[in-house]
């Protein structure tokens, strides 16, 4: 596995993306690169069981199965201890999300899509490299729509991150 040299920048960019979704408010509009965009409401989950159901629905969407070869592979979802991170375990194809009250920040759609993109990434090396980022943006486009995908492209680019 290659060194994951872009991980911290990816996490910083995604923190900014989450803040944009949070700020979009009831009208779901944000200003980005001089353009007003309407973002979809971001799903929030109450438990790892809710995340599991969501991941299965997304994985079986025709737009996902047609685009990503690895979508046919099942994904397990489990609770994890601690509240600082969600993560994906390639061996065992498992998404782990914190289920504690302090870990609720991770029970949101953008975080779950980040972890699901690790599952769908055909290379997984480096873990947050250009192929992964292209997979993530394609997944966001298919699930949340083109406006959300544009937000990802612009902000990832602002952080100097390249998509393949």
Regions found by a protein language model. Name each.
Residues 115:
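Walker B catalytic acidic pair
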